[in-house]
Curated annotation (Swiss-Prot):
Pfam families: Apo-VLDL-II (PF05418)
GO cellular component: chylomicron; very-low-density lipoprotein particle
Name of the protein this chain belongs to: Apovitellenin-1
Quaternary structure and interacting proteins, as annotated: Monomer.
Function statement: Protein component of the very low density lipoprotein (VLDL) of egg-laying females. Potent lipoprotein lipase inhibitor, preventing the loss of triglycerides from VLDL on their way from the liver to the growing oocytes.
Organism taxonomic ancestry: Eukaryota, Metazoa, Chordata, Craniata, Vertebrata
Protein source organism: Dromaius novaehollandiae (Emu)
A molecular function GO annotation: nutrient reservoir activity
Domain of life: Eukaryota
Single GO BP term: lipid metabolic process
């Protein structure tokens, strides 16, 4: 499955999260202490807060984009193609 099908998330951080998970797994296998440092760094309140903010705001943008596309589709079908 692709990243988008597997996670089924609306936010735009799906790919960066997948890359970060891959990097963490690789580093953790080779250098467990560095892996632990990365895991600890990911839990710093500033990083967690920033990540949550980005997820929340990009989710809003995704919803707005979906709504806009639905309106454009409806407009196209009614005004251009003449469907009611």
């Amino acid at each position: 499955k692709s990243i988008f099908e597997r996670d089924n998330r609306r936010d735009w951080l799906v790919i960066p999260d997948a890359v970060a998970a891959y990097v963490y797994e690789t580093v953790n296998k080779m250098f467990p202490k560095v892996g632990q440092f990365l895991a600890d760094a990911a839990q710093i309140p500033v990083i967690v807060g920033t990540r949550n903010f980005l997820i929340r705001e990009t989710s809003k943008l995704s919803i707005l984009a979906e709504q806009m596309m639905e309106k454009v589709k409806t407009l196209w079908n009614t005004k251009v193609l003449g469907y009611y």
